[in-house]
Amino acid sequence: MAKPRHYIFLLAALVVFFGCSGIRFSHLSPEAQDFHPQSMAIFDIGAGGYEEAREAVDRIVTDELTAKGWFQKVLSVQAVQGLFKENEVLRKASADYLAKFNAVNFSDPELSKKISEEARIDALLLVNIDYWYYTKEEGQNVAKVGLGMRMIEAKTGALIWKAMHHLSADYRFSKPELKSVATDVVKQMVGVMPH
């Protein structure tokens, strides 16, 4: 009887070990099961001190989401900002929503619904740049990029999915481009994103 327990324990340990080989953190809300957005806006990119990376990350995330073909419409941060110029109601609702979200980590359902109606989108994607630099780790030169993403159901303001991931690329002489490391990070994160 003791042998089957050992096998069960070993099997469970292997599942845990190999099951953790994806992105570093991903949390899916129960509502995600029934949420299948047709349109998404990359609503904000929090640069966290890495302003030079904001435009590149916007392009990389937009391109990856578009390439997946999961959504009929994907709006980049630049496209959303273009809508702000045309629509004062959307601009004000968005500014108020982001101020509240950033100040108290609260997704206001009324403001989110207003944004959904004005921009005609189903989901908001908020992106944070956590790392974007070259450094030395354990004596090795590395290019390091880390991102966080949160998907919000625009009509209700519900947090559907959040994830964090980072990758490091070792190098000796020639530095890898941070954009290419970021592309790998985004591909892995989008790969586990609900759709």
Spans of features found by a protein language model:
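Short aromatic-hydrophobic micro-motifs that form the base-stacking/packing surface
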Residues: 125
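N-terminal segment of the mature soluble domain
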Residues: 48-120
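C-terminal/domain-edge helix-coil "capping" segments
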Residues: 20-41, 59, 106-107, 111-122, ...
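Bacterial N-terminal signal peptides that target proteins for export
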Residues: 1-9
